[in-house]
Amino acid sequence: MAKKVAGQLKLQVKAGSANPSPPIGPALGQRGINIMEFCKAFNAATQEMEKGMPIPVVITYYQDKSFTFAMKQPPVSYWLKKEAKITSGSKTPGKGAKAGSLTKAQIKSIAEAKMKDLNAADIEGAMAMIEGSARAMGLEVVG
């Protein structure tokens, strides 16, 4: 017989640096999930990734206190900042100076990496979503 799902929890954890301190510890602890077991499993699963990369993770926990987790691709904003070589977006997007610029080729590479996590039918739709995110961060799309 299948385990009964008690709930799901969505967190964003930096790759290779899950630890029991807030916000991870309290979020897992109040649901009865073994915090250290999750931290060890997550860090092992992300050891090949760039340390510090934000990874969205969906944790499904069961009534017997066991859990499974699924990792997704880093957020679009992370990829945009990395490609544009900036630390943060514009404080006033759409007005004044641009925070940086990206080419259509860079947007396409991000879209291909994020395609399975996006709600887009094709690569052009995914590129349009990512261009919108770039404009919202004050980035200019050229080419």
Swiss-Prot record:
GO terms for biological process: translation. Keywords: Methylation, Ribonucleoprotein, Ribosomal protein, RNA-binding, rRNA-binding. Gene3D superfamilies: Ribosomal protein L11, C-terminal domain, Ribosomal protein L11/L12, N-terminal domain. One or more lysine residues are methylated. One of its GO terms (molecular function) is large ribosomal subunit rRNA binding. The keyword Ion transport does not apply. InterPro entries: Ribosomal_uL11, Ribosomal_uL11_bac-typ, Ribosomal_uL11_C, Ribosomal_uL11_C_sf, Ribosomal_uL11_N, Ribosomal_uL11_N_sf. CDD domains: Ribosomal_L11 (cd00349). One of its GO terms (cellular component) is cytosolic large ribosomal subunit. It comes from the Bacteria. Pfam families: Ribosomal_L11, Ribosomal_L11_N. SMART domains: RL11. Belongs to the universal ribosomal protein uL11 family. Forms part of the ribosomal stalk which helps the ribosome interact with GTP-bound translation factors. Part of the ribosomal stalk of the 50S ribosomal subunit. Interacts with L10 and the large rRNA to form the base of the stalk. L10 forms an elongated spine to which L12 dimers bind in a sequential fashion forming a multimeric L10(L12)X complex. NCBIfam families: L11_bact. This is Large ribosomal subunit protein uL11. The gene is rplK.
